[in-house]
Structure formats: C-alpha cells, structure tokens
C-alpha cells in the first residue's frame, strides 16, 4: 500500500483558525509527527494514532521519521505551527527528499496543507498593518548567519517596507532585536509604530502597541511565540490600532455619510 506525507499547517494554535483541510488530513492519518508543543495543539484529533513527539531542535529527526513512516505505507501528518511553507517544515522535507533522489512524479506522495501564519494572525489583531509592501525577517541565527540577517534588515529598512519580525528573541538571543532597532532608527523616526504580539489567539495572548522609542521597555513580551510588526513611514496609530494606509485617501473622500456613534 502506498503511503502519503502531509505537511500540515495548524495555524496559530486555536482550532477555530485551523483550516477544514488541515483537520481532515490529520483525522485521516495513521501517524502524527511533530514538535511536542505543536502536536499537543491537535491532541483531541489524534486519539488512537501512532504519535512521534520531538524536541524543538530535532527537526531533522522529525523529517526522517515521517518520510520513513510514509515510505512504509503509512498516511502521515507532519504538524507545523502556522504555515509549513513559512519558516516551517516544508523546506526541510523537500531538501531531505531531494538529497535521497526522490522523484515527485513517481515517488512518495507529498502534499503541503497551508495554514494561517503568524503574519496573518497577528496583523488581524492590531488593525491593518500590512496594506502596502512588507518584508518578513526571522531573527533566529541558528541556521542563517547573523551578518546575513543584518543585511536583510538593512535593505528592508532602507526600502521603507513594513517589517514583520519572527523569532525576535529567546533565552540565548537577546541582542538581535536591540541591533535591529538601531538599524531601523537610521531610516525611521522614534515614533514609528511597533506592535508586539505574543501568543496570538491563545489563552495567553498579549498585545502591545508602542513605537521604536519605547519598544525595548517590553522585552518581557518577547519570545519564540512572539511576533513584532514595525510600521513604515506612512503607518500610524489610531485608538491602539496600527493603520498602514493603502493610498485611497489621496484619491477619494473617505468620510462616512453618517457620523459614527461612539
């Protein structure tokens, strides 16, 4: 019997924001593989299945296990938080298969199940911060040299992109966001809006709307489940929301026909 490997994005962590297709393939699977925290997010969907839980740094072991199980004829779901194609497990799966000489037309079937990424879920909680061009940068230098990350931050800052920052800090990484702030201040004012979202759509969710001048005061809100969104030169704060205007105001009258009651 031919197996199949699904790489499944489960979104920010709450079932309400998991796609129907993601739930469907997890329920259809014989085997579930993933980082233990992410597997626990779908615990109620995996009763009676073979489950392989791994620590955070065991990405390669996760990839090898799910490929082995699928090659042995199992239907496997590799669980990834957010979207597996954005800093997720999709890349490692394809790299591992490519190294083994895999042929996507005749070999093991692989399907990526997209999910709601942190940039989507976090943006939805703070207004409309991503209405114009934006860049996404991860501060994690475990696999990418810090010098390259700095170059990318510099380019995004100089280009006046709204910047979404993944993995802004950890117990071992405390200087990265501080260095990033210094780079941003070369091109942006101190009152540039900044949002810090931790645990989006989870019970522990917290949201801070601040600016480049004061963002370091909220270091306790930073971590691996935090996302930072830095506005560009046109972004502004409005009643604790970040608005990144698309440009309609310069061409149209945006006043409502009737006064909105507060």
Q: Which residues fall in each region the model found?
A:
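Class I S-adenosyl-L-methionine
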Residues: 1-110, 218, 257-261
């Amino acid at each position: 019997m031919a197996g199949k490997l699904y790489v499944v994005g489960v979104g920010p962590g709450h079932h309400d924001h998991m796609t129907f297709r993601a739930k469907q393939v997890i329920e259809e699977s014989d085997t579930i593989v993933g980082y233990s925290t992410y597997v626990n997010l779908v615990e109620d969907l995996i009763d009676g299945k073979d489950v392989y839980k791994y620590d955070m740094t065991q990405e390669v072991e996760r990839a090898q296990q799910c490929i082995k199980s699928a090659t042995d004829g199992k239907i496997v779901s590799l669980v990834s938080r957010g979207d597996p194609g954005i800093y997720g497990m999709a890349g490692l799966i394809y790299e591992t298969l490519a190294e083994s000489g895999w042929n996507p037309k005749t070999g093991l079937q692989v399907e990526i199940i997209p999910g709601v990424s942190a940039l989507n879920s976090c943006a939805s909680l703070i207004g409309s911060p991503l209405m114009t061009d934006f860049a996404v940068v991860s501060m994690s230098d475990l696999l990418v040299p810090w010098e390259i990350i700095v170059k990318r931050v510099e380019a995004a800052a100089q280009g006046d992109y709204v910047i979404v920052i993944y993995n802004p800090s950890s117990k071992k990484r405390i200087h990265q966001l501080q260095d990033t702030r210094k780079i941003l201040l070369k091109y942006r004012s101190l009152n540039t809006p900044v949002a810090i979202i931790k645990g989006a759509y989870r019970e522990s969710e917290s949201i801070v709307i601040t600016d480049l001048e004061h963002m370091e005061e909220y270091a306790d809100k930073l971590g691996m489940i935090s996302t930072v969104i830095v506005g560009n030169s046109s972004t502004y704060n409005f009643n604790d929301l970040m608005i990144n205007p698309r440009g309609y105001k310069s061409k149209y009258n945006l006043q409502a026909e009737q006064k909105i009651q507060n």
